[in-house]
C-alpha cells in the first residue's frame, strides 16, 4: 500500500486548484465585508472626479416599435461598470468568446459576488457581417469580439450589483454632468459634441435632426447629455451608427411611401366606386 501509485487527471487537479482559489477568495470576502454606503460614495466620487469621466458613465438609446412609439433605454456604460465593480469589491469577473459561426460572435460574461454568493452569467451576440453579407476581416472580428465580451461583463455586473444602487449612482453622476454642461456653456459643449461625432461621419444637421431641433440655438444641456449617451453607446458597441441614425430614417421613408401608396389606392378605389355608382344611376333612368 505504501508504494501504491495514485493517478490524478489534469482536469481533477485543475478543478481542485480552482475550488481552492475560490474558497480562499470567499473567505477573504467574508473577512473584509463591504460597507454599502461607502461603496456608493466611492462610485460617485470616482465617476465625478473628472468631467470627461462623468460623460462616459452612461449610455442612451432610442428604439421605435411597430406602432411608432419611442422607447428610451439608458444605463451604465462599460467604463462605469468598471468603476462599480472596483468600488463594490469582492467580485469575481470573467469574460470570453464562446462561439463564432462566421455570422455572429457570442460572448459570455460572468460575475460572482463572493460575499453574498450570488452569480450571474450573461451572453451577448454581435454580427460580423457587412451590409453586403461579407464576413468581417480577422482584425475586425477581434474588435467586435472584445466589445461583445466587455458588454457581456457589464450586463453580468449589473445583474449582481443591486440595480437600485446602480440607478441611484447613475442619476447622481448624470446630474453632475448636466451641471457642468450648463456651467461651461451649452454652445461650447455643442461644438465639442459635433466634433466627436465627426469620427463617425455624422454632421451637425444629423445630430439636430436626431434631437428634434432646427438650429444649434435651440439645443439644450439635456440634448447634449443625451448625445453624450448615444456617443458612448456607439463607442462601446452597444449600438451602431446605422442602427441609431440611418435605419430609423430608412424605416420612416418606407413607412411614408407605404402610406402614400395606400392613400393613392384608396383614392383610386373611391373614384372607381363613384364612376360605378354614376353608371348605375344612368342605367336606372333609362
Language model features: what each stretch is:
Residues 1-105, 110-258, 284:
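Polyanion-binding surfaces on beta-sheet-dominated domains and ring/shell assemblies
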Residues 258, 262-265, 269-272:
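Composition-driven recognition of long, low-complexity, acid-poor segments enriched in small hydrophobic
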Amino acid at each position: 500500500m505504501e508504494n501504491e501509485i495514485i493517478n490524478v487527471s489534469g482536469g481533477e487537479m485543475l478543478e481542485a486548484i480552482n475550488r481552492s482559489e475560490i474558497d480562499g477568495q470567499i473567505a477573504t470576502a467574508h473577512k473584509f465585508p463591504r460597507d454599502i454606503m461607502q461603496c456608493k460614495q466611492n462610485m460617485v466620487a470616482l465617476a465625478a472626479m473628472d468631467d470627461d469621466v462623468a460623460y462616459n458613465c452612461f449610455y442612451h438609446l432610442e428604439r421605435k416599435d411597430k406602432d411608432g412609439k419611442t422607447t428610451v433605454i439608458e444605463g451604465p456604460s462599460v467604463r462605469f461598470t468598471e468603476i462599480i465593480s472596483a468600488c463594490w469589491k469582492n467580485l469575481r469577473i470573467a469574460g470570453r468568446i464562446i462561439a463564432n459561426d462566421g455570422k455572429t460572435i457570442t460572448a459570455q460574461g460572468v460575475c460572482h459576488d463572493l460575499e453574498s454568493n450570488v452569480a450571474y452569467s450573461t451572453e451577448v451576440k454581435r454580427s460580423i457581417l457587412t451590409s453586403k453579407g461579407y464576413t468581417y476581416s480577422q482584425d475586425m472580428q477581434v474588435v467586435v469580439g472584445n466589445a461583445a465580451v466587455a458588454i457581456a461583463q457589464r450586463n453580468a455586473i449589473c445583474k449582481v450589483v443591486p440595480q437600485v444602487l446602480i440607478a441611484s449612482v447613475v442619476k447622481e453622476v448624470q446630474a453632475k454632468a448636466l451641471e457642468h454642461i450648463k456651467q461651461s456653456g451649452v454652445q461650447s459643449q455643442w461644438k465639442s459634441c459635433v466634433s466627436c461625432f465627426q469620427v463617425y461621419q455624422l454632421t451637425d444637421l444629423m445630430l439636430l435632426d436626431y434631437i428634434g431641433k432646427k438650429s444649434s440655438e435651440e439645443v439644450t444641456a439635456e440634448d447634449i447629455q443625451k448625445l453624450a449617451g448615444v456617443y458612448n453607446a456607439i463607442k462601446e458597441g452597444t449600438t451602431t451608427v446605422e442602427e441609431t441614425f440611418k435605419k430609423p430614417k430608412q424605416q420612416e421613408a418606407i413607412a411614408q411611401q407605404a402610406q402614400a401608396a395606400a392613400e393613392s389606392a384608396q383614392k383610386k378605389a373611391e373614384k372607381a366606386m363613384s364612376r360605378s355608382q354614376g353608371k348605375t344611376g344612368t342605367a336606372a333612368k333609362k
